[in-house]
């Protein structure tokens, strides 16, 4: 699912994309943007409150996902506006079967994941750090514009794990909602309630991969836990975006 610089250029040129912001491929030097949902500690460490791992991250270190870094006691995301995978897919490929059926979805992902599934289909990007992959500068405004140019009525955050590029999903979804291009999130559901509720205010649909029905499987095969995922299902249902579950 990784894209080389040449393939990225082909996608964008094929779209006839005249983006207002310049599009540049980069590797090895991810840009830092302020992260949301974390707590500062007196020691200079931070505690990430984005997902149930609640990583305690010392200065100069990263969380388990590999895409969020403590710099001088402040937490930053290293993947904001910097997708490493970009494609146009049928929405059923997500899979979402009952939300805008028959539509083409502008689909994107960044590096990183908060799970380490032994059976991951997209491990080439989900289990990599951002500096290990080529990516492009594609801010939310450009994402929505590109979706319109490609005549995609929906934007899908997919392939890796949208939870770890929370800020990018949030801003794309908010802008897309304003401009009539809904966003959907294809997720493992391993996220804290507060950031999930924030996303649900903007998302058109959420699809959760329910990988198993037991804690041992989640712990041993995914590096996560089942209970927070079940809590996510209840929260999404209560917040009212369209919800689909794939087992």
Task: Map each language-model feature to its residues.
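C-terminal segment of N-terminal export signals and the immediately downstream linker at the start
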Residues: 22-57
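Local cysteine-cluster metal-coordination motifs and their immediate loop/turn environment
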Residues: 46-67, 111-123
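Conserved C-terminal portion of the radical SAM core fold
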Residues: 227-247
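Alpha-helix N-cap and loop-to-helix initiation/capping positions
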Residues: 135, 220-228
């Amino acid at each position: 699912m990784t894209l080389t610089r040449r393939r990225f250029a082909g996608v964008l040129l094929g779209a006839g994309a005249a983006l207002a912001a310049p599009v540049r491929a980069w590797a090895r030097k991810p840009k830092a943007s302020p992260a949301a949902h974390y707590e500062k500690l007196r020691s200079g460490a931070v505690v990430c409150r984005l997902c149930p791992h609640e990583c305690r991250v010392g200065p100069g270190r990263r969380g388990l996902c590999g895409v969020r870094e403590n710099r001088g006691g402040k937490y930053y995301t290293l993947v904001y506006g910097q997708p490493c995978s970009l494609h146009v897919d049928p929405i059923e490929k997500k899979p979402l079967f009952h939300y805008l059926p028959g539509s083409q979805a502008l689909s994107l992902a960044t590096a990183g994941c908060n799970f380490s599934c032994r059976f991951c289909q997209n491990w080439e990007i989900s289990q990599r750090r951002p500096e290990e992959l080529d990516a492009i500068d594609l801010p939310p405004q450009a994402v929505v514009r590109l979706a319109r140019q490609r005549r995609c009525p929906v934007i899908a955050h997919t392939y890796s794990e949208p939870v770890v590029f929370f800020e990018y999903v949030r801003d794309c979804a908010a802008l897309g909602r304003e401009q009539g291009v809904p966003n959907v999130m294809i997720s493992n559901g391993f996220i804290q309630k507060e950031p999930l509720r924030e996303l649900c205010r903007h998302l058109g649909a959420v699809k959760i991969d329910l990988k198993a029905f037991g804690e041992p499987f989640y712990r041993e095969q995914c590096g996560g836990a089942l209970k927070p995922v079940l809590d996510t299902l209840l929260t999404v249902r209560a917040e009212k975006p369209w919800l689909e579950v794939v087992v």
